[in-house]
């Protein structure tokens, strides 16, 4: 691209989280003058950043976005590979379900460390600046005017050519767009909340298998654990809020864990479990959908601001990072023409982001209930077998989502088609087995034991059975 296409144009990125910081890097590479406005203080110097910290699962889509700005190797080196789900049954039995083939894995990444690295990357560009402690209070994107409140709480107007809303599920930018006609918006809170717990290292090593995402599925609730670089595990307990409210005391919590997660107690330690459980209240999870993602050539939403999703497919960050990558690819395609790029971004991306939102809701049930069933394990084995013999025809859903850039909505369509083909194949196979079994049964039952029914009535049966005493009784199993 020619630098004159963008040089001198100002972009205001609202939100300095993961997607906002990554977007700033992409835009700075295109020679925009980039200003990132982040309401929080700089997490790199903050004393405590505890809060929203469900560990992240970095997969192929996210890695491709990081690769495009030259950060993939740096980030991957700070992650722990996870090659399988490790299912913990109530009895303590463990069973591994691989995510894909032997070379495929996802990475457990620290949200905080990733955000720090991305902010540092933004500041490496001379044409980009991050304004910490600056909160958006008013947005008029058609006029390119924003009002922000700095650390001194004094309103200050700034001007820009493009507003990029990356300010999360409760986006202020989106709230302003919602006042516009023909802007659709829905949100849904799920009944479950989440709480973060910790499994510390044991004798300086991991207390469990490190290269797995550990799951304790218990139907109505579940717990997961992701490995960290310091040999600890970050655990997340997902449970209906009503269940959390039934655990007001330490003894209630201990009884609950002894009943539902007995093998986790010695791993966490009773004292650490109590400390973590009562440190913060359970946090809500929200799913957000909106349409369109843009306003003319002036404003665009990305990441959670456009499509907050529940965390059960591990694609929230990856989908947000892919937003940035798709937008960058469209900027190439349309030679940095914002009036063409923004509408195409909405048209292209909305079906995909809504599809991964729906898949995450589906996985919300699968992870806490279905993984316990033998039918689920059979389906996974069948998917793996079919993919091995027909790799380009049958691709497991998780493989399409986590290890390719097949569009999310196309992956869903293909998944439904594959399920239909497999179900029909199993029906035909079952029918053939039933027909074959019936034929063999009828064939054997039509042999000699029924001959007496065809004898003349006047011969009676006495003579028949009398003669039969002189020889072995001729029934099918005597042949």
From Swiss-Prot:
L-kynurenine binds at residues 85, 99, 363, 398. FAD binds at residues 19, 37-40, 57, 111, 136, 172, 304, 317-318. One of its GO terms (molecular function) is NAD(P)H oxidase H2O2-forming activity. Disulfide bonds: none annotated. GO terms for cellular component: extracellular space; mitochondrial inner membrane; mitochondrial outer membrane; mitochondrion. Pathway: Cofactor biosynthesis; NAD(+) biosynthesis; quinolinate from L-kynurenine: step 1/3. It catalyses: L-kynurenine + NADPH + O2 + H(+) = 3-hydroxy-L-kynurenine + NADP(+) + H2O. Its cofactor is FAD. InterPro entries: FAD-bd (IPR002938), FAD/NAD-bd_sf (IPR036188), Kynurenine_monooxygenase (IPR027545). Catalyzes the hydroxylation of L-kynurenine (L-Kyn) to form 3-hydroxy-L-kynurenine (L-3OHKyn). Required for synthesis of quinolinic acid, a neurotoxic NMDA receptor antagonist and potential endogenous inhibitor of NMDA receptor signaling in axonal targeting, synaptogenesis and apoptosis during brain development. Quinolinic acid may also affect NMDA receptor signaling in pancreatic beta cells, osteoblasts, myocardial cells, and the gastrointestinal tract. Transmembrane domains are required for enzymatic activity. Belongs to the aromatic-ring hydroxylase family. KMO subfamily. This is Kynurenine 3-monooxygenase. It comes from Mus musculus. The gene is Kmo.
């Amino acid at each position: 691209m020619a630098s004159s296409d963008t040089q001198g144009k100002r972009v205001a990125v609202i939100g300095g989280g993961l997607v906002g910081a990554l977007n700033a890097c992409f835009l700075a590479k295109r020679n925009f003058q980039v200003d990132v406005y982040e309401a929080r203080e700089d997490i790199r110097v903050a004393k405590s950043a505890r809060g929203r910290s469900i560990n992240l699962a970095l997969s192929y889509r996210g890695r491709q976005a990081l690769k495009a700005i030259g950060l993939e190797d740096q980030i991957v080196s700070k992650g722990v590979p996870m090659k399988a789900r490790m299912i913990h049954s109530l009895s303590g039995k463990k069973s591994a379900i691989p995510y894909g083939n032997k070379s495929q894995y996802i990475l457990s990444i620290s949200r905080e460390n990733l955000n720090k690295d991305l902010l540092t990357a933004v500041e490496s560009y001379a044409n980009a600046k991050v304004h910490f402690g600056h909160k958006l209070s008013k947005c008029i994107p058609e006029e390119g005017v924003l009002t922000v409140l700095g650390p001194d709480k004094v309103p200050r107007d700034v001007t820009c050519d493009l507003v990029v809303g990356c300010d999360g599920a409760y986006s202020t930018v989106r709230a302003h767009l919602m006042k516009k006609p023909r802007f659709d918006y829905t949100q849904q809170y799920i009944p479950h909340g989440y709480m973060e717990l910790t499994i510390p290292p044991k004798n300086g090593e991991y207390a469990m298998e490190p290269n797995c995402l550990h799951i304790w599925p218990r139907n109505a609730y579940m717990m997961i654990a992701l490995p960290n670089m310091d040999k600890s595990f970050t655990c997340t307990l997902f449970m209906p809020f009503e269940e959390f409210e039934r655990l007001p005391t330490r003894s209630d919590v201990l009884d609950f864990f002894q009943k539902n997660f007995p093998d986790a107690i010695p791993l966490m330690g009773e004292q650490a479990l109590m400390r973590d459980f009562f440190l913060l209240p359970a946090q809500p999870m929200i799913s957000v959908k909106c349409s369109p993602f843009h306003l003319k050539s002036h404003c665009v939403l990305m990441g959670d601001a456009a499509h907050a999703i529940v965390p059960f497919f591990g694609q929230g960050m990856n989908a947000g990072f892919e937003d940035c990558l798709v937008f960058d690819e469209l900027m190439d395609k349309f030679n940095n023409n914002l009036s063409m790029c923004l509408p195409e971004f909405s048209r292209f991306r909305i079906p995909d982001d809504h599809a991964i939102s729906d898949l995450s809701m589906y996985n919300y049930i699968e992870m806490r209930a279905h993984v316990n069933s033998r039918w689920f394990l059979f389906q996974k084995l069948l998917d793996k077998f079919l993919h091995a013999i027909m790799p380009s025809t049958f691709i497991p859903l998780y493989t399409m989502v986590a290890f390719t850039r097949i569009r999310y909505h196309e992956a869903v369509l293909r998944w439904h088609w594959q399920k239909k083909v497999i179900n029909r194949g199993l029906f035909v196979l079952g029918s053939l087995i039933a027909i074959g079994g019936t034929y063999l049964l009828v064939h054997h039952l039509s042999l000699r034991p029924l001959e007496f029914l065809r004898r003349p009535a006047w011969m009676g049966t006495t003579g028949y059975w009398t003669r039969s005493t002189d020889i072995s009784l001729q029934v099918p199993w005597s042949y």
